[in-house]
Amino acid sequence: KTARQYTDLSYITSNREIGMDASAFFKDLAIGNLEGTYHRLLVAPNSMKTRITALIDREIAKGPKGYIFLKLNAITDLDLIQKLREASQAGVQVEMIVRGICCILPQVEGETENIRVTSIVGRYLEHARIYCFGKDAEELMFISSADFMTRNMDHRVEVGCPIDSPQVRQKIHRIIELQRMDNTKARRMRSDGTYRRVTTGKLPIGAQDALMEDAMAAANLSAPETDHPWWKRLLRR
């Protein structure tokens, strides 16, 4: 039942540095150590917020050339909200897709005018979190289990993983681009906290529908169509 409603991202990699971090992380969990040191992974509650703050500062230093993209379920942490506000004031373009609770008001002149917030609620309950800092060759991309909430950053064990593979980054950028183009389920947050439906474009584009079509096309390439009942059920979904 859950699998029919929820979507998320997972990552399988042979990257040695990430593997070493993951091994150390689970060893630390086994002995109750929440203060481990990790080189590639972002790990809460001990260091994730500090490292995210440093990544935002990295973009602030670029001024108007800086860029941040965040896909989250929620953002409520005051420290990170303040840091994103600082980024906006420095001219950094901050693009956020926040499905649920969002405690930062975008497009407030002199404060958050460079922040744009969109919410997409559709057939599937999306749980993927994506963080991108910078663009093109300078981009640092992460997938994560953590929202920008105090409970995630300070009171839970959470992990963010860097994405180095060009092929995987391309797939994630495909998700981001489709959600940018969504004009059927997307709602844009205004400076007063209300939401307005996105109506750009002449043709209706639903990000979730497009991604489902991508998945079906990939399945057709990797496995030929069959008469098995499970395949027919999948086609009817």
Report each predicted region and the residues it spans.
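PLD/PLD-like phosphodiesterase catalytic module centered on the HKD motif
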Residues: 1-19, 29-36, 42-237
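Core active-site phosphate/anionic-ligand binding loop and the adjoining beta-turn-alpha structural block
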Residues: 22
